[in-house]
């Protein structure tokens, strides 16, 4: 328990340090700050997860003083054999993708380009599994170029160095068996500043973990014989309701389906799914308007899909005046009616009649 607490404290220190770096380079409370924080944190998590798993399948790496160096010295065939032995929810990383490799290249003048290309190369290599998508089936990769958000070109390489410098102080390896109970709190801490800051309206999309847990207990009750369960949230936000439900049911017994119009929510949801060992559900995390373009269909592709559990905490007031008539043109689906567009304060437009 004390060991986990120490790791948790170090994780919080890492998040604070990454936010401080963004502040130093002029992106504190900037609209792009959350992209940097969440993606760099996720990179650290996946790097350590990969290291943890490869040492389980390779005695040579497990016994190496520096496993990253031993991994880099392996033949390509040996590395491919390791890839074949890894669970499907583990990203495939080459030696040049590892944090240790970036650390060793920090002195190079174009380190910002090296950092960005590393992130995008990881995303490209793992896009089949580690990606979400839009309602139009466009893949949303795991990572993107991050130093582009620093306006001053000359500050981009130092910014990248400052980020990598924060990632080498500890490893998540000791905490990976804690799963939800450890990382749920971390996720809540990670996004807390973006609930009100950064130009966003995250209060509309976020449900506190404690409330989500109570809702999951009420829904599932004492049911234990649960298998192949499908859970859905049509306004998923950061996915907290779905994570609590999956934890109550059992992550290995359910599949998550989600949709939300917000690009930012989708990035947060992606992080949440990965932290909670629900990588297999990433493909079902859709960014798009649930009202006019619901993505999840039945197996025959004709009707809307039905689910075992549906949870939702939608924004009960929002401006959907642009799509109101399209929604009203679907009376079978919206049989209870569609609210009229108010003359003033469209942002307070009710979502129900």
What is each model feature region?
Residues 157, 304, 345-351:
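Short, solvent-exposed loop/helix junctions and linker helices
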Residues 1-214, 218-219, 281:
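Non-catalytic, mostly N-terminal accessory regions of nucleic-acid modification and defense proteins
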Residues 316-350:
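Mobile active-site "lid"/loop adjacent to the S-adenosyl-L-methionine
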Residues 197, 255, 338-340:
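A short, mixed-charge helix-start or loop-turn motif at secondary-structure junctions
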Residues 201-312, 317-328:
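Conserved S-adenosyl-L-methionine
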Residues 207-211, 346-353:
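Phosphate/oxyanion-binding active-site loops and adjacent basic polyanion-contact surfaces
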């Amino acid at each position: 328990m004390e060991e986990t607490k120490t790791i948790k404290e170090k994780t919080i220190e890492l998040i604070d340090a990454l936010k401080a770096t963004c502040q130093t380079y002029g992106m504190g409370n900037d609209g792009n700050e959350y992209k940097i924080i969440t993606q760099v944190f996720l990179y650290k998590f996946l790097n350590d997860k990969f290291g943890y798993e490869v040492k389980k399948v390779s005695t040579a790496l497990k016994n190496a003083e520096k496993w990253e160096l031993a991994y880099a010295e392996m033949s390509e065939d040996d590395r491919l054999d390791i890839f074949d032995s890894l669970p499907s929810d583990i990203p495939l990383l080459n030696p040049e993708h590892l944090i240790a490799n970036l650390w060793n290249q920090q002195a190079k003048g174009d380190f910002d380009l090296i950092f960005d290309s590393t992130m995008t190369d990881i995303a490209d290599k793992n896009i089949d599994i580690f990606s979400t998508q839009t309602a139009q089936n466009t893949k949303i990769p795991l990572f993107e170029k991050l130093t582009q958000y620093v306006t001053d070109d000359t500050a981009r390489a130092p910014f990248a160095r400052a980020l990598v410098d924060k990632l080498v102080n500890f490893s998540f390896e000791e905490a990976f068996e804690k799963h939800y109970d450890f990382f749920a709190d971390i996720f809540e801490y990670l996004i807390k500043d973006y609930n009100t800051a950064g130009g966003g309206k995250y209060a509309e999309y976020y449900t506190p973990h404690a409330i989500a847990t109570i809702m999951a207990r009420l829904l599932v009750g004492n049911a234990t014989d649960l298998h192949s369960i499908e859970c859905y949230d049509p306004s998923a936000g950061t996915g907290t309701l779905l994570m609590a439900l999956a934890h109550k049911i059992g992550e290995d017994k359910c599949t998550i389906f989600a949709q939300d119009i917000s690009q930012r929510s989708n990035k947060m949801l992606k992080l949440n799914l990965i932290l909670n060992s629900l990588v297999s559900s990433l493909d079902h995390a859709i960014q798009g308007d649930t009202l006019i373009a619901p993505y999840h269909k039945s197996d025959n592709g004709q009707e809307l899909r039905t689910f075992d559990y549906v949870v939702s905490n939608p924004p009960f007031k929002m401006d959907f005046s642009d799509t109101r008539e399209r929604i009203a043109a679907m009376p079978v689906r919206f049989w209870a009616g569609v609210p009229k567009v108010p003359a003033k304060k469209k942002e307070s437009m009710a979502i129900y009649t």
